[in-house]
Amino acid sequence: MKKRLIIYFNYHPNGQADAACRFAAQQMAAVGQVFFVNNGPLQPESRQWAQGCCHTVLERENTGFDVGAYRDAVLQIGLDMLLQYDEVVLMNYTLAGPVGDVAAMFAAMDGHPELDFWGLTRHYAMRSHRFGGAKAMVPEHIQSHFVVVRSRMMADFFAYWQAAALPASYEDSVRLHETQFTAHFAALGYRWDTFVDTKDLASLFVNPIMACPKLLLADRGCPFFKRRSFFTPYVDELRRTDGQAAAELYDYLKSETDYPVDDLLRALLPVQPLAAMAQNLHWHYILPQTAGECAPVLLDANTLAKGCALQPDAVYYLPLPRAAGVEGYYNARSMPTSLQLAQAAELFDAHPLVGVLGPALPLYAGCATEKARRWQQQKPAVQAKLSALDCPLPLDETPPPLPNGGCLLVRGAAFPQGLPPLQTESDFWLVPLLAQYNGYASATFETAAQCAARADVLDASLAAQRGVGPVFRLMGRTVKNALRKRKESAR
């Protein structure tokens, strides 16, 4: 086996080496020595794990993103030591995996001795003002989440990092390093390629590992996928794909592989926006047609107002304050029957990751508008209450999937500290968020008939969007031309 050094970069807002990071580093240790570099200090338990698992551990100031981490690691190792390795791997925590035997990938690439450096996947050329610099063009390149450099390129590789400047933003990191690394070394005469062959997808997707991760894992031998698949902004995802990539990826990992995907999701939940994860993973279920033998325990308003402990193996029913107006009317109509509540409670057995369930948002458009408005109004109070409970969470502009309608169902195990006092509207927003902090998802449910109606509402909404699309495009061109003329007149 080749002598290989793996420089593994990790970052976690709470200083953790989470479950997915540990799995990756431990698996990579089977194919090389792991140099673990962390942006920011590690928590004591994570530091102890890293020191026991990895060959070297470097904790550095959280500056420069991945560029800063790789640069400090390379410079600390030094050129003389780097030259003792056949290959040096740069990889980071944004990849999850490996799924299957990662050694097979290295064995396959050993069959290409003509390459001087190679990567896992590539990003195809695209126009981008955000990442493309002055020319607004991103070239085709190896994605920086996994790059392998061979020994004959090592001197120039070391010189590259000696000269590398620390980026001040994520955009700078992509623009000045990731999109330029491949071209820089290709211009020096070094040959490169990627392990995963996606040439047939180049005309469809500029970023195949995000657009079709399940395809790459199942059919192209790719041993890794992006964590971001599960929390990318869903509106952005719908601009590129049909919005099903993450759910398909999860189902494949869960049913066809041994990869501990639920451990990854539990690690992501406390640090990523709940709404984005719920949308990408479609945490929305049709009520099972069963007798509904699991009757939830009612927690009345007086009990909720005081706060209470919960039994971990029990399911509880929480009534919510009634809304006013037309929205209140439709919220009341969405209240499940006793049978439907019992059927919904059975969903907890089928979905162990779910800690909170509630009715889907009513189809009346005003309910979504009012929920978004109330979330923006209540968000500062919710953030303050989370801080008081010592539960730092990222709150998105998009409201959490729950609460909706007039009730919530909760799994006792999702609240090991119990429920805090719940009286006001901002209090009840805490329920899905506290479950999220404890590594549990929130999901909505509805009947099959409601789901069929929702599809018709979606069709009507899309038709309306198509109708106004040309108007917005015309407005955009008008504004663009006006700005161009103003710029020209100012010269």
Label each region the model flagged.
Residues M1-R491:
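ER/Golgi luminal nucleotide-sugar-dependent glycosyltransferases, focusing on the catalytic module
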